[in-house]
Structures are given as structure tokens and as C-alpha cells.
Amino acid sequence: DESGTPGYPYCVAITMYPFLVDGLIKLGGVSVAPTDLKSFCGEFINLVYSISSQFMGAVATPEFLMYLDYFIRKDYGDDYLDHLEDVVEMNTKKRTLVKVIDNYFQQVVHSMNMPAGNRGYQTVFWNISYFDESYFRGVFGDFRFPDGSEPKWETLSWLQKHFMNWFNEERNRYILTFPVETMALLTDGKDDFIDKEYADFTAEMWSKGHSFFCYLSDSPDSLASCCRLRNSITELDKVDESHNHTTHQYSMGTASVSTGSKSVMTINLNRLIQLAT
């Protein structure tokens, strides 16, 4: 990377579970664990900015939408999809629930696209992930929130699709670089997708001009959170005599969601071509 030095931590994907338990205390902040949708969004912005100041590259939060859905359900109930058009803000605006959700989307996304002084007045490099149902259940099937509850696929699926459509439309009004998005789709190991609905939705979003990465895997043991980083748990025990590494790029994290990279060098081919001519 032309802007940095080798050896400095480049990018990282984090698990947000400690954030749910301790808030920002362990990072030197004063905010305790978020308790509702409003505090979650505000503290999440501070979380990403705090971590990004320690890295030159991306901060990936694959669980962002799953946690956002958790706090929406805490505030408005597990059946909030049945009340999207209900007025939930009794002020002069009289906003419906879906409008409130859109406003939180806007708060988080627009804040992430603001230049940061501790990053040379560049924005944070923020990545998120989407999952089809099979991939989601493979990665988060045994996951439980601190209160013992489990993620709810039906509401998360709606939230993922709604965010993608909202973000695609928002980019028609503003120049928004982040988040960089990765859609994780599980295949049958041959030439087809297990969750055909999400495969069709992915194609639909591309047809609408949306720009995002797509990660295909025949096993939910691995995860990609950005353009270059992939990790795999089950392949750790495989040995290839031709080299001494596996596909599990493990340097800073502790799980399939939490990982990172170091000394990543990006070749700027466009610049090389310009200099050569």
C-alpha cells in the first residue's frame, strides 16, 4: 500500500460480542454496553472509529446487521415486520417504524463516510457482510446474545434486503464509499446455490446497479469480509506438501468472524501503467 509501511497492521474483522457485553470500556471509552437501538447505533459508530485508528486498512463487522436486528426487536418486538407502517414517533414528524429504521441506517452510514483526523482526514474503511439462510445458520446457528436469545432469520433477512435496497438508492443522492459489502452464498459444491431465493436477490441487486462483492463457498466454515481475506477452519488439518500454509489466514482474531491480516501490500496497477507511459 503506497500510503503505509509494511509490518503495520492493515485490516481486521472483529466480532462485536465484547461490545455487547462491555460497551467501549475496554477500548478506553466511558460508554457501557448499549441497551437500545439508539445507544447501539451511536456506540457502534464510535467503536468502528476507535478500532480503525489502529489499522491502516479495513475494519469489518460481519455481524452488524444481525446485531442491529437484535436491538430493533428489543425496542419494537420480534414481530416488528408486522408494524413497519405503524407510527412509532409521536412528535411532529410522526415517523413510521420503517422510516425510523431508515434514519438509523442514514446516521450510521453517513457518519462512517466522514473524514477522520486520526486517519489523515480519510474516512474509516468499513466492511459488512450479508448471508443467505444456509450460510447464516452455518455460521451463527449456535450463537446466543448476552440475554440468552438467538438471532431471528426472518427479521434479519428482511433487514439485509432492506438495507441493500436503501443503500443503493442512497448512493443516487450522496457519494457514499462505505460500507464495502460482501454477500456470502452457500453452494451445493457443484454448480448451483442452496438458497436460490438469495441467489436471485443477489442477481436482482446487481441488475439495479448495486456494487458489492460476492463470496461463494460450499462450506459455511469459511468467511470473507473483504476483497482479499478468506479464512477456513476445516482446512487447517489439510497439508499440502508444496507449501506450508493453509487457506486459514489467521493473525489477529479468535474465530471465523474475528480475523485479520498484516503486511498486506496492494499493487496499484493503474498507477504503474500511468508511470510507465
List the model feature ranges, each with a label:
Residues 1-277:
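Conserved catalytic cores of very large enzyme subunits
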